[in-house]
Amino acid sequence: MAATDFIVAIELGSTEITGIAGKKNADGSIRILAYASERSSDCIKKGAIYNLDKTTQCLTSVIKELEETLHAPIRKVYVGIGGLSVRSIRNTESKQLGEDTKISQALIDSIMQSNREIPLIDREILAVEPQEYKVGNNLLTEPVGVPADYIEGHFLNIIARHSLKSNIKQCFKQTGYEVADYFLSPLVTANVVLSDSERRSGCALIDFGANTTTVSVYKNNILRHLAVIPLGSENITQDICSMHFEEEEGEQLKLRFGSAYTELSDNDEETNRSYNLDGRCTIPARQLEDIVEARVNEIITNVWNQIMVSGYGDKLLGGVVFTGGMTNLPNLDKAFTHITKIEKIRIAKSSEISLEGDIELPQDGTQNTLIGILASGKENCCRIDPRKGVQLSFTEDLQQKEAEAKRKEEERKLKEEEERRQAEEAERRHRIEEEKKRQEEERAMKRQKEYESYMETGPKACWEKRIIRQLFRKLNMQEP
């Protein structure tokens, strides 16, 4: 039986584009109805689209596969936004008030609007996280109703390049599917991975991706810092491949033998051992360990630097939470503790939301953002026939789409024909004007020549010659 009430979520990852359809239950759990994925490494890098056409093809393929599983047409989807250019910046807006003015919601809204209007070069604000409001000597999160003569709002703005969102819009416009809403990927991931206690006590959420690592710092249930580091698990694979291995071999060596942290050993057997990949390639164990650990240490050092930059490095009572595909690398938590001295670490390979249904998602930390997008969606994404007020069947929807595509193609051809006709008419008029101009110039030149000839041979010219002749005679001079 076809599903007619569901939510669809799409995540644009650097290794694959994933799509999911599900239905929310009354108890807060989600029933998974469909799942699809397509490789995206040749069209998305570090979370940003760089090939619009290939991304459009991948998106179309993913959504079509979801439709086939659902046996129902999809009208719109919810999309996650992330990537290297996403980061947080702090801003302060203040307003002088009359004496003992009661702060209203309208006043708070106006301060927030002023914050959104700050000038940014090649950037746009994707989300705003109010930090607190300074009223008198107090810092409040909910200042409405408090009398004051001055208020100062502190905001954390999440910004990104204009092209990040505009490229996504272009791709979905080409697919013919609507975007119900855009969600900031780090925020929705935190919604389904972090507990209320962790958010309140203070914690750092580290999402280890393929091309990027995202750092989100929370305290008192408020996002305090967000940064994206341009390093991920794929960098480890590339480092291994630099030892003259194919990419697939490097990935397999990492997955089968890689470790983020290894205890030093003086045992000769341990020192001289090697790793063999099904007889295809061999690498000394110590060499592989050094390669993996060096890159992991670099990533963790950058992560820790961002946590310290946030100003909350010593306030993370809730510890650190890991998620993302790189969490499958053994001893990642030990490596983090070795560098940062933080021991309270939790690895979240699945979300806090209960999932049900016949479709089982990978429990490796790679699907948490997708689940977060799905959980944040609210509207039914099934296509509805506006004439009947009911959901179209999959076949009817395909027929309607084909008819619509045919109509648009005919309109396009008519438009092109009209443009061609107008261009030909404009060209014809141009040629006529040019011919008129040429003929007018020829007539003008002819009149000029006739005038010059007249001046040389006409009556006036003859009279002038007689006067000159008589003058020469009177002066007894020989005519020239």
List the model feature ranges, each with a label:
Residues 348-397:
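Glycine-rich phosphate-binding/hydrolytic loop that grips phosphoryl groups
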Residues 1-16, 20-203, 260, 384-480:
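Nucleotide/phosphate-binding catalytic cleft detector across ATP-hydrolyzing
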Residues 9-10, 19, 79, 172, ...:
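Residue-level signature of catalytic and energy-coupling elements of molecular machines
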Residues 310-311, 331-344:
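ATP-binding/phosphotransfer module of carbohydrate and carboxylate kinases, centering on a glycine-rich
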Residues 10-16, 81-82, 205-212, 218-221, ...:
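A short acidic Gly-Thr/Ser loop motif
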